């Protein structure tokens, strides 16, 4: 009998408390970058019933109305009704932002490689904003080269948001979660969806029967291809029986608490660093994007069915301390060849990544819900496949 295995990933909607915090942090980042592309930003957000706290470190000469940015973001998400316990116009906003530490700024603004040497490459100028390790991943089981469980999980909560905002399902409220379990065969290929879990906030008048019927017919069956569903697929819709109290009224939220949702749903390793609220000198963010860029182009080039890229940095140093590529036995060339090619083709210094991916632009708010990787609804530079030919040529 062939061996089959299950793998599960989850996603959350833009109205989930942690995602509200992520979106506020990235909206602040975008507002600052729109006025000052050279700004250094590390904006953290905490949300709970009736209150938002924004704190962190920022170095910029630009003025941004933090209060307005926070309220506009909350309204865009859909928290515009005081009955939700969290509303854009009535929430208390408490900003507490200070200047970036000069000790950190010293290493970021003048990398180890250029100190005392005026003849260095200008892209050596910016040092990594911190030490750390980052991972990027790609796999050929979906069109967007993402693991199927996280891809489906994101699409389910995005569909819920579309139905809520269009008014097609009028009783939906902003908070929601999804979880998808996929069955893989002995060749590690997805063959069916075993379980779908969806919890969605709703008005008190909505019945469980109505919610169950709408979610299955208008969400699940619209998102998940019928070839993956069968009579053994299990659906759990609002399994607690009631989800009226949600959002920050139900749970507090913090920036950076959904790092697995933001990336690969647990299918790949994670270095632990969050993305939202951080400008691109923070390699937690920029190097994770670069690693995805490398992995996706490797798989798209047919050099592996699955690829995981690890990058690691030392604070204040421009060049990565290590580059590691793992193809899990699916590669068509040696991993050492791929690593050499990656170093040749992709500039992995922080300034090189920023230039390569054009990361000084205000593009981050759109990434802060429904995943930073594998997005087909928005144009993200690390999702482009413009290095495929160069990789093929480099490993000949």
UniProtKB/Swiss-Prot annotation:
Pathway: Amino-acid biosynthesis; S-adenosyl-L-methionine biosynthesis; S-adenosyl-L-methionine from L-methionine: step 1/1
Residues holding ATP: 16, 175-177, 242-243, 251, 257-258, 274, 278
Cofactor: Mg(2+); K(+)
Cysteines paired by S-S bonds: none
UniProt catalytic activity: L-methionine + ATP + H2O = S-adenosyl-L-methionine + phosphate + diphosphate
Family assignment from sequence similarity: Belongs to the AdoMet synthase family.
Name the UniProt record assigns to this protein: S-adenosylmethionine synthase
Organism name: Streptococcus pneumoniae (strain ATCC 700669 / Spain 23F-1)
Lineage: Bacteria, Bacillati, Bacillota, Bacilli, Lactobacillales
Designated gene of the protein: metK
